[in-house]
Structures are given as structure tokens and as C-alpha cells.
Amino acid sequence: MKQESADFQFENGMKWQDLGGGVQRQIMGYNDNIMMVKVKFETGAVGAPHVHSHSQVTYVASGVFKFMTDGETQIVRAGDGVYMKPDTMHGCECLEAGILIDTFNPLREDFL
């Protein structure tokens, strides 16, 4: 079944989903092939290491994060990006409160 968001997403019309542990998520635009998600982290919050079958590209909109992917760890800041291959262990720790913009291919049905 085809899934698709509205054409426009406005900050004041989107709800934050509380994921616990100082992490919140907003679902942005999506269809069956792609999804964009905004994730807000408080300082010290952790995106626990995990694996999924999706390609993922993350843009650091604000803050500072320690990211681990495919066995490598780097500090990333606003303006930086991270690519996570499918089926690769990855996770992050928020060093300074911030927002990540995650893009997935295909759509993360488990987020809807």
C-alpha cells in the first residue's frame, strides 16, 4: 500500500513524539521510498547502537554529537553529516543539545 505525507510540513503543525531519555522525534515528509525525520536531543541523551536495513544520511542541524558507525567514532557538529550503510551498527551520544535531520531509504514504516 502506498504511503505518503502531505506536500508541506510546518513546524507549528507537527507533533513531537517523546522517545524518552531526552530524545524527541518529528516525522517530516515521506513516501514509500524516502523519509525525513527531525530528532531533538538533550545534552547527554543517547541514540542507542542499533542496526536496520535502511540507508540513512544524517545532517547535524545544531549541537555536537559523538557518532559511531561501522566501528568508527567521530565528533560531528552543526553543518556536518554522517552516512550509515544498511545493516551497519550505528548510534550517537549528544554532547551539546541539538537537532539531527535523518533521511532514510526506504521509508521507516516502524516510525508511522
Name what the model sees in each region.
Residues 40-41, 51-67:
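Short, conserved beta-strand element in jelly-roll/cupin
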Residues 86-110:
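Ligand-binding loop in jelly-roll beta-barrel domains
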Residues 1-33:
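A short, N-terminal "cap"/entry segment at the start of jelly-roll beta-barrel domains
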Residues 57, 64-66, 73, 89, ...:
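Structural motif
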Residues 46-47, 66, 82, 86-91:
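Histidine-centered metal-chelating micro-motifs
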Residues 20, 35-51:
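Conserved short histidine dyad/triad with adjacent acidic residue
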Residues 61-62, 77-78, 96:
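A cytosolic small-molecule/anion-sensing beta-strand core signal
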Residues 71-86:
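Short acidic-glycine-tyrosine-enriched beta hairpin
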